């Protein structure tokens, strides 16, 4: 007897998802999982979160805002409904669209503050792959909440639109891509 393939939310396969960016390949975890909920198993050590499924990391970022703090089931439903909308609009695997959005929304360069002789100035530094993913997921979730705040648009639709726009690299529609470009522009001026 052959076992069925394990799919995220019982619908979407991670088997055909391709990570194009070689720097992010080791840090975007696409292991098949029914429900992306590991109950903090990978938070004990420094780089353990690279072992966490990328969908669960998105769910955890969605869960951070005021009204959703600690409500993981609500965040899981938001992400699942957003994935349904993405699948209807793009006719693609929503996990592949999410991976493309992370690749386009993660900044490659950032700045750090350096104090030298009492004078503080910014110095351009390269971003690590793990930080690129963290910043991209945070900005995608933040952009969705900003689009849904004080509007009739539900959060699921706002999250789906943000992920689709970030996957296309659309600066006009995606908050995450705009923030990435702004961060890289500031870093370039601080070289």
Swiss-Prot record:
TM helices/strands, residue ranges: none
Family annotation (PROSITE patterns): RIBOSOMAL_S7
SUPFAM superfamilies from the UniProt entry: Ribosomal protein S7
Residue ranges of coiled coil: none
Keyword Cytoplasm among record annotations: no
Gene Ontology BP terms: ribosomal small subunit assembly; translation
Function: One of the primary rRNA binding proteins, it binds directly to 16S rRNA where it nucleates assembly of the head domain of the 30S subunit. Is located at the subunit interface close to the decoding center.
Subunit (UniProt): Part of the 30S ribosomal subunit.
Matching NCBIfam families: PRK04027.1, uS7_euk_arch
Family: Belongs to the universal ribosomal protein uS7 family.
HAMAP family in the cross-refs: Ribosomal_uS7_A (MF_00480_A)
Name recorded for this polypeptide: Small ribosomal subunit protein uS7
Organism: Methanocaldococcus jannaschii (strain ATCC 43067 / DSM 2661 / JAL-1 / JCM 10045 / NBRC 100440) (Methanococcus jannaschii)
């Amino acid at each position: 007897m052959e076992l069925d393939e394990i799919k995220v939310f019982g619908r979407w396969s991670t088997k055909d998802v391709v990570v194009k960016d070689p720097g992010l390949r080791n840090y975007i975890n696409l292991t098949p999982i029914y429900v992306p909920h590991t109950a903090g198993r990978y938070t004990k050590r420094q780089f353990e979160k690279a072992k966490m499924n990328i969908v669960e990391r998105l769910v955890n970022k969605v869960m951070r805002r005021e009204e959703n703090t600690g409500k993981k089931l609500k965040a899981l439903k938001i992400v699942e409904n957003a994935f349904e909308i993405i699948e209807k609009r793009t006719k693609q695997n929503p996990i592949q669209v999410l991976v493309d959005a992370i690749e386009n929304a993660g900044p490659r360069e950032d700045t750090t503050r350096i104090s030298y002789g009492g004078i503080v100035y910014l110095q351009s530094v390269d971003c690590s792959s793990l930080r690129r993913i963290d910043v991209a997921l945070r900005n995608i979730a933040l952009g969705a909440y900003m689009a849904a705040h004080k509007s009739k648009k539900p959060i699921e639709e706002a999250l789906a639109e943000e992920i689709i726009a970030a996957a296309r690299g659309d600066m006009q529609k995606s908050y995450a891509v705009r923030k990435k470009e702004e961060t890289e522009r500031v870093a370039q001026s601080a070289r």
